[in-house]
C-alpha cells in the first residue's frame, strides 16, 4: 500500500495534559481529533473518564466520543475499523489521534494481527482436555509460544492450540504479522511529566471528579445498567459501585481510584516507551506552546 497521507498521534499517560496541546495543535493545523480512549466511546460516562466538554473543544470536531451504550462491547477491532473508515474517507483532512489506550493506537498505526477469532466448537473441544493433554498439544503445535506460557495457564494454552487447529499455522508466527488498513504515515508524539508531578496531577484530577459529581453520575448509570457497568472494568466506576454496594467506604473509593489511576499511568508509560517510533516531550521541561510549535514543524517537514 502506498503511503500518501500523514496524521499525528498524541499519546501519553492519563492526566499528563494531552487535551490542551491537541486542541491548540488542531487549531493550528485545521485538523480534526479522533479520540483514542477505550472508555470515552461510552455514552454517559463523562466525569469519570475526564471526557472533554463541548466548550473545551473550541470548535474542533471530535470523533469516537459517545458512540456506544455501556451495555455494548466495543473492542480494539471495532476501533480499528472505525478509525480507518474515518481516515480513508477523508484523506484530504488533517487528523490527530489523541489518547492513552496504546492497544487502540497501535491497531491503527501498525495494524491488527491476523489471528483468527475464537471458535466456539474448537473451544468446547479444548475444555474436554486435562491440563497435561492440553500442554502436550500446545508443545506439539507451537513449542516457541508454549515455552513462554505457564503450564497452568489454560486460557493462553488453549489459544495456542486453537490458532493452529483453525489455520494450520503457529500462533508465534501469526502474532507477528499485522495488516495495516490505511495509507497514512503517523508522526508519533508522546507526552510525559516527572513522576511526582504526574501523580500529583492525577490525585488532584480525581478530587475534581468527585467535586463535579462523580458519585451521582455512577449511581445514575448503575440504576440503568446494573452490573453490566461494572463489567466494563473502568477506573473510577468500579470503585464507586463497590461503595454503592457498601463493600468499601467513600474514602476508600477515593483512595483506590487515585491508586489505580497512578498504576494505570505507569502501565501506559511503559507501553509507549516500548514503541521506539514515539518522540517524547516532557511538559515539566518545555512549555505547551513550544511543544505545539515543534510538532507543527515536524509534521510539515516529515515526508
Swiss-Prot record:
Q: Which Gene3D superfamilies match?
A: 1.10.20.140, P-loop containing nucleotide triphosphate hydrolases
> GO molecular function terms here?
ATP binding; tRNA dimethylallyltransferase activity
Q: Which domain of life is it from?
A: Bacteria
Entry's EC annotation: 2.5.1.75
Which UniProt keywords are present, listed alphabetically?
A: ATP-binding, Magnesium, Nucleotide-binding, Transferase, tRNA processing
UniProt xrefs under Pfam families:
IPPT
Cross-referenced SUPFAM superfamilies? P-loop containing nucleoside triphosphate hydrolases
**Where exactly is the site Interaction with substrate tRNA?**
101
- Binding residues annotated for substrate, in chain numbering: 14-19
Catalytic activity from the UniProt record: adenosine(37) in tRNA + dimethylallyl diphosphate = N(6)-dimethylallyladenosine(37) in tRNA + diphosphate
Cofactor(s) required for function per UniProt:
Mg(2+)
Annotated binding of ATP, by residue:
12-19
Segments spanning the bilayer are: none
| InterPro entries attached to this UniProt entry | Dimethylallyltransferase (IPR039657), Guanylate_kin-like_dom (IPR008144), IPT (IPR018022), P-loop_NTPase (IPR027417)
Write out the ranges of the annotated region (Interaction with substrate tRNA).
37-40
Output the GO biological process annotations, alphabetical, semicolon-separated: tRNA modification
Q: What does this protein do?
A: Catalyzes the transfer of a dimethylallyl group onto the adenine at position 37 in tRNAs that read codons beginning with uridine, leading to the formation of N6-(dimethylallyl)adenosine (i(6)A).
**Which family does the UniProt entry place this protein in?**
Belongs to the IPP transferase family.
Assembly description: Monomer.
Instruction: Give the protein name, as stated in the record.
Output: tRNA dimethylallyltransferase
Task: Name the source organism.
Answer: Fusobacterium nucleatum subsp. nucleatum (strain ATCC 25586 / DSM 15643 / BCRC 10681 / CIP 101130 / JCM 8532 / KCTC 2640 / LMG 13131 / VPI 4355)
Amino acid at each position: 500500500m502506498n503511503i500518501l497521507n500523514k496524521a499525528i498521534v498524541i499519546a501519553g499517560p492519563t492526566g499528563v495534559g494531552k487535551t490542551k496541546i491537541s486542541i491548540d495543535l488542531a487549531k493550528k493545523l485545521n485538523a480534526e481529533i479522533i479520540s483514542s480512549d477505550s472508555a470515552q466511546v461510552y455514552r454517559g460516562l463523562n466525569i469519570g473518564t475526564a471526557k472533554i466538554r463541548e466548550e473545551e473543544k473550541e470548535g474542533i470536531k471530535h470523533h469516537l466520543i459517545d458512540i456506544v451504550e455501556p451495555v455494548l462491547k466495543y473492542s480494539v477491532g471495532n476501533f480499528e475499523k472505525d478509525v480507518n473508515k474515518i481516515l480513508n474517507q477523508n484523506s484530504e483532512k488533517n487528523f490527530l489521534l489523541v489518547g492513552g489506550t496504546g492497544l487502540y493506537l497501535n491497531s491503527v498505526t501498525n495494524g491488527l494481527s491476523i489471528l483468527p477469532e475464537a471458535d466456539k466448537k474448537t473451544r468446547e473441544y479444548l475444555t474436554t482436555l486435562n491440563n497435561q493433554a492440553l500442554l502436550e498439544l500446545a508443545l506439539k503445535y507451537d513449542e516457541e509460544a508454549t515455552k513462554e506460557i505457564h503450564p497452568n495457564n489454560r486460557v493462553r494454552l488453549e489459544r495456542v492450540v486453537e490458532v493452529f487447529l483453525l489455520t494450520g499455522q503457529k500462533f508465534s508466527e501469526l502474532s507477528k504479522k499485522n495488516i495495516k488498513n490505511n495509507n497514512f504515515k503517523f508522526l508519533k508524539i508522546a507526552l510525559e511529566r516527572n513522576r511526582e508531578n504526574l501523580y500529583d496531577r492525577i490525585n488532584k484530577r480525581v478530587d475534581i471528579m468527585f467535586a463535579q459529581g462523580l458519585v451521582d453520575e455512577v449511581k445514575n448509570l448503575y440504576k440503568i445498567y446494573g452490573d453490566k457497568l461494572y463489567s466494563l472494568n473502568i477506573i473510577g466506576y468500579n470503585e464507586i459501585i463497590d461503595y454503592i454496594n457498601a463493600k468499601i467506604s467513600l474514602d476508600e473509593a477515593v483512595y483506590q481510584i487515585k491508586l489505580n489511576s497512578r498504576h494505570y499511568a505507569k502501565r501506559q508509560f511503559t507501553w509507549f516507551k516500548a514503541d521506539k517510533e514515539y518522540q517524547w516531550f516532557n511538559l515539566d521541561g518545555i512549555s505547551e506552546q513550544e511543544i505545539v510549535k515543534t510538532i507543527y514543524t515536524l509534521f510539515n517537514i516529515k515526508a
